[in-house]
Structure formats: C-alpha cells, structure tokens
C-alpha cells in the first residue's frame, strides 16, 4: 500500500500543480505529446525529423503493415506493466520461404526510458526494409527475416514524451527505493513551468559539488583543497513525503536492462525481484526462445556513439573464437556507422569513451583510422543486460549501439567531459541542449537555481540531427544481417555403382560470415548441429540413416557427406539441409532408370 503524503506535502504539491499545470508522477494522467508537433504518417518519402509518441508508433506500424502486406505482418507479443501492447513487426519476402526458415535479425528500441532515439532507429529499420528500391535490400529480404520491436518499455517512454519527467531506466512496476514502505511516492515536478524537470542546485558550504574550472555551469565532485563555492544538487521537484529527501522514490525502480536472465546478479542495482520478472522482458525472452532462427540482434540505446558487445564481465570469460568474431564484426560496424569506439560493456567507461584503450576495444584515432589499444584493469560490470542474455542463452551475435555522440573530445583524453559538451552545445546547437541556471524560490528549500541538460540535444539528438543517426544505425543492422550464417548446398551428385545402386555425394556449405553456432553454445551443450536429409519416391538408403548431423559449420566453410542408395525407378532425389540460424537449403538430382 502506498503511504499518503503528509498534510504539509499535500499542500505544497497542490501549490506546485496549480502553478505549473503538471505534477509528474507515475499515477498522473498523461498529457498531450510535448516538445514536438505530430509526426507525419508512414510513407516512402518520409524523413526522420520528428520523435514519435506511443500512439504514433502504433499508427506507424499499422500503416507499414497495411502498405506492404507481402513483406510485413504485425503482432503484439505481450503487454507492458500498464497494459500497452508490445508490438512486433515481422519483415521478410515470403516468396523466398517461410520466415522461420531464414536466418533472422532481432531489433528493439525503447528499453531505456529517456533514450527515445532508439525507438526512431528501430522505426528507421522498418522504413528502410519496406520502402527501399535498392536491389541488395530486396535480395536480403528474400534470404533473411527481421523481427522489429520498436518500443519494448512503452510506459516509461510515454513519461518521457508526454510529461516533464526525464524518467530513469525502469519499468513502471512500483518499487520502494528508499525502504520506507511506500511506493513511488516522491517523484519529480516541473517547478518553473518550462515543460521539463531538470536539475536544482543550492549553495551549501558542506555540499559535495563545485563548479568546474573549465566552465562554471558544470558541477564536478568536490576535491580536497577546493575553495568553493559548494553546492547540493537534486532533480527538480519537492519533498512529497516529508522525509527530508528529494526524488528518492521516483516512478518504477526495476531497470529492464538489468533484469534479463543472462549474467543476472542478485547484487546489481535495479535488477528486480528475480531474473526476467518484468512482463516486457519475459515477453521478449519467450519470443526469442520460440524463434531459434534469430542469429543476430541489435538493441538500440543512447548515447555516446559507441558499439557495445558482450560481455559485461572481463573478456577472458568469452570463448576466444566468439571474441574474434565480435571484434571483426565490430570493426566492420564502425566502418559502416562512422562511430569511433567499439567495446565490451565491461570495458566501456561511460558516458563517452575510455581514456585507456583495451585490447578488446576498437577505436578511431584523430586521423580517422581504426585501431586497437592497450590493456586496462578496471571495468564496468552491468549484470542482467540484453546482449549478454541473447548471447549466453540463445547464441545470438548481439550488439547494442549507443546512438549519438554529443560533443567532441577536445583534449584527446578519450572522454567528452561536461565542459566539452557545453562548448558543443554553445557553438553547434545554439545552446538548445542546456538550460542556463536561473534562480527560483523553492517552497521547501528556499532560494535555489534550476537549469541543466534538457531532454533533447544531450542524450537524444535534436530533431534536425535525427535522420543521420537513424541512417547510420540502419546501415549497421543491414551489416549484421549480411553476416549471419546461411546454408547452401554446393554439391549434389549421384554416381552409378552398378545396377540400381548409386553413391550420393553432397556438400553442405555455410556461405555466411558467422558460424552456425557460437562457441558459448557449444561449450554449454546447447549447440544444434546442421542436419542434412535425403529422400524421394522410390529411394532406399542402403548405408546409414537418411538424416545426418553435420555438426557446427564455421563461417565460409563446407562439409562433404555421402550416402549409398537404391533407386527402384527413375525419380528425383532431394537433399535438404537445415539449421535454425543458418536457414533451410534444398537441391535435387535425377536418379535411376525408367
């Protein structure tokens, strides 16, 4: 049961609500879409210069499926905590075979609440696949299937788009963050009525923050010997429950990207009551389990302009062959995306890069060349993430692109610090990403200043920069699709042995770049072998079984096999090869006599 605010807090909250017209809490009724005009409808000529709210995402997907019924089908794979549909669009050219018989790529967005550019990138994948006139895209759709789920956690994405709140990464399952027995009782408020709940600061000689020497607008952590001034800081809002803390129990509390049942940890903050506890994450995992043809995945996030791969633990825990595959694909990913860094989650120094490059990282130097770097001992363990889960459990080559780099590394230390981001905002964005500090009379704290980074421009690009980010990330997904495993029958011959007996000689190849199974699956005993099977009317197999297991096929490799058969009459011998991630291939040869 949610604890009721004190009488004083209720009075203050009422005052704030009347003065701003909004009170941003999980239980509040959502207002209209903020910040952007309605987005134009789905159309071949549309451009991505608008952020979609959930209703517009739904309409986009319905329109896309209706416009291209031969390529796209729309379904809901589950419900969010608040009951919104988790929409998924299956895209493939069915004239090339059943969707489940082709190697597939999973694409999702909207997992982290304030990273709404990820939704646009996923919609961009849909748009490119359906509307492109490029023959290579048409050919890819004959040979691949795409499963695109643009809005995995729509409840909190809606908070971002339709309330002043910049929500944390969370589902909207209520959670007692501060352990007081109440749930979600102290959220944020837009006190100054500018449409966004930003940051408050107040001078205090005991504060932990002080202005940066590089730019006084930026607060950095206090160091020994600092002279001040010193500040306290909070997210904009009031103390709703009268406990002396501010915004310590905001809406939700379970981080969906720490709730996946891959490398999940009981000690990870935001992990939830148990692995896969959240309805949205469970729906995704159940879909993946039911679709073993998913060979690659892209889980869009923001920001940093970084290509992330597993693991969320040190690289030595990854099988070497899998690590080698990831490094080669990541390097190609940097080439097609133009981003500057590809790294494991563990070795990524959030938010903008790593000052001491690791051997497992690939990065772009000042001349634009892609390089590998030196070793580093420290790391960032983020347990229960999507790419670890898809990789570990299902053997999927999973990437997570952190879309959009805001600013430049002016001093070459491998990071984009706050003052460097502010310079970029001043010079390139005309100051639209950062609100200058302005005084405000807080009903509880007294005189404070309100300002800081706005919702768009820092973590999500401004609308005019959105299309380029969408383009480069769609290119990355198509690169992933081109490099999945893909089975082909490269040889099928029937050699007469005398009478009506023949030796059937066959070769099954993986003409894709990736192996049919990753080493992580082989080591865990979960690998599925490539299977080859012969048959036909009047065909009798004399040696062995008509169905053979060919094991795992590495990328660009082939395996020969043979059978001895009897053909009692003239008929057609058929050979089929299948692997869930490599697809289905078939061929036939005439055999026997009249």
What residue spans do the PLM features occupy?
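Edge beta-strands of extracellular beta-sandwich domains
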Residues: 583-593
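Short helix-loop-beta-strand segments that form the rim/entrance of peptidase-like active sites
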Residues: 118-162
């Amino acid at each position: 049961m949610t604890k009721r605010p004190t009488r004083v807090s209720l009075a203050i909250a009422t005052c704030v609500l009347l003065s701003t017209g909004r009170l941003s809490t999980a239980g509040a009724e959502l207002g209209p879409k903020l910040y952007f005009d309605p987005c134009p409808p789905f159309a071949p000529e549309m451009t991505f210069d608008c952020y979609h709210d959930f209703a517009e995402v739904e309409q986009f997907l319905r329109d896309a499926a209706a416009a291209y019924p031969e390529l796209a089908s729309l379904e809901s794979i589950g419900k969010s905590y608040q009951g919104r549909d988790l929409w998924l669009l299956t895209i493939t050219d069915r004239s090339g075979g059943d969707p489940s018989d082709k190697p597939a790529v999973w694409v999702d967005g909207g997992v982290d609440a304030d990273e709404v550019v990820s939704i646009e990138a996923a919609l961009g994948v849909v748009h490119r696949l359906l509307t492109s006139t490029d023959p290579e895209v048409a050919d890819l759709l004959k040979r691949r299937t795409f499963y695109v789920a643009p809005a995995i956690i729509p409840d909190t994405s809606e908070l971002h788009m339709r309330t002043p709140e910049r929500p944390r990464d969370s589902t909207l399952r209520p959670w007692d963050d501060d352990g007081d027995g109440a749930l979600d009782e102290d959220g944020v408020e837009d006190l100054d009525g500018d449409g966004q709940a930003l940051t408050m600061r107040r001078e205090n000689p005991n504060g932990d923050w002080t202005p940066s020497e590089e730019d006084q607008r930026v607060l950095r952590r206090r160091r020994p010997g600092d002279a001040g001034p010193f500040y306290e800081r909070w997210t904009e809002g009031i103390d709703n429950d009268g406990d002396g803390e501010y915004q310590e129990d905001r809406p939700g509390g379970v981080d969906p990207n720490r709730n996946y049942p891959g490398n999940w940890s009981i000690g990870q903050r935001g992990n939830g009551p148990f692995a896969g506890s959240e309805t949205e994450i469970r729906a995704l995992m159940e879909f993946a389990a039911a679709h073993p043809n998913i060979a690659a995945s892209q889980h869009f996030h923001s920001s940093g302009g970084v290509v992330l791969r597993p693991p969320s633990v040190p690289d030595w825990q990854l099988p070497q062959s899998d690590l080698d595959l990831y490094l080669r694909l990541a390097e190609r990913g940097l080439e097609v995306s133009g981003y500057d860094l590809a790294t494991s989650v563990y070795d990524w120094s959030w938010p903008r890069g790593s000052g001491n490059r690791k051997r497992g990282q690939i990065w772009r130097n000042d001349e634009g060349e892609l390089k590998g770097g030196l070793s580093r001992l420290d790391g960032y363990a983020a347990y229960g993430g999507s790419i670890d889960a898809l990789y570990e459990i299902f053997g999927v080559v999973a990437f997570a692109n952190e879309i959009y780099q805001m600013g430049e590394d002016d001093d070459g230390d491998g990071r984009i610090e706050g003052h460097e981001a502010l310079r970029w905002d001043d010079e390139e964005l005309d100051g639209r990403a950062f609100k200058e500090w302005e005084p405000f009379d807080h009903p509880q704290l007294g005189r404070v200043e309100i300002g800081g980074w706005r919702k768009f421009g820092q973590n999500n690009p401004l609308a005019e920069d959105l299309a380029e980010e969408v383009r480069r990330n769609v290119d990355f997904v198509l690169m992933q699709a081109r490099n999945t495993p893909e089975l082909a029958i490269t040889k099928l011959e029937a050699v007469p042995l005398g009478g009506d007996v023949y030796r059937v000689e066959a070769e099954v190849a993986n003409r894709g770049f990736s192996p049919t199974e990753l080493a992580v699956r082989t080591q865990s005993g979960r690998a599925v072998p490539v299977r080859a099977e012969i048959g036909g009317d009047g065909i009798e197999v004399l040696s062995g079984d008509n169905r053979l297991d060919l094991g795992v096929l590495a990328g660009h490799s082939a395996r020969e096999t043979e059978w001895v058969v009897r053909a009692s009459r003239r008929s057609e011998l058929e050979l089929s090869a299948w692997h869930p991630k490599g697809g289905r291939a078939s061929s036939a040869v005439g055999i026997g006599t009249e």
